[in-house]
């Protein structure tokens, strides 16, 4: 939690601890689905199978609505993907921003989506090039955004739902795909 008031740079180091840059990659709806399917494999803990929690490897895709039907077999857990209220077509192309850790293959997301890590033909923007090596780091981009905005009032927007059981999905009125 960041307290109200001035946000010194040290708070941004606490908020975003890694030295990352951003890449913009064009991905299809099917590649996004596979990416999210890979994330669903990280919702349990080996030491406690009843625990369904996140961590570093439970990626979300902001702006895309989707449902995680955890009870479904792997490969069929991501259902009802929509963008701007419309179903996502497998061949629909999206511009996706990811950090260099993901782009270079970190945690296997690129491979899971059928993409080759560090395939620079997939990207048309890298913040290290467009903003410079230091200014292009995520934490420095955040700092500049905060300076430009002067004041930030964070909001939370949920763009996905998680259903542990089929009964949970039905009770919520979700469209259950077998």
Predicted regions and their residues:
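Catalytic centers of hydrolytic enzymes
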Residues: 1-178
């Amino acid at each position: 939690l960041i307290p109200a008031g001035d946000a010194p740079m040290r708070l941004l180091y606490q908020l975003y601890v890694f030295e990352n840059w951003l890449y913009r990659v064009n991905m299809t709806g099917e590649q996004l689905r596979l990416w999210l399917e890979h994330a669903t494999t990280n919702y349990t803990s080996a030491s406690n199978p009843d625990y369904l929690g996140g961590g570093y490897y439970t990626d979300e895709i902001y702006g895309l609505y989707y449902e995680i039907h955890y009870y479904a077999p792997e490969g069929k857990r991501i259902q009802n993907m929509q963008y701007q209220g419309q179903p996502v077509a497998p061949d629909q192309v999206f511009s996706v921003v990811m950090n260099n850790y993901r782009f270079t293959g970190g945690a296997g997301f690129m491979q899971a989506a059928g993409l080759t890590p560090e395939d620079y033909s997939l990207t048309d923007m890298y913040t290290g090039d467009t903003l410079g090596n230091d200014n292009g780091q995520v934490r420095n981009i955040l700092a500049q955004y905060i300076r430009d905005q002067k004041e930030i009032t964070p909001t939370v927007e949920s763009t996905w739902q998680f259903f542990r059981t089929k009964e949970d999905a039905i009770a919520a009125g979700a469209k259950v795909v077998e």
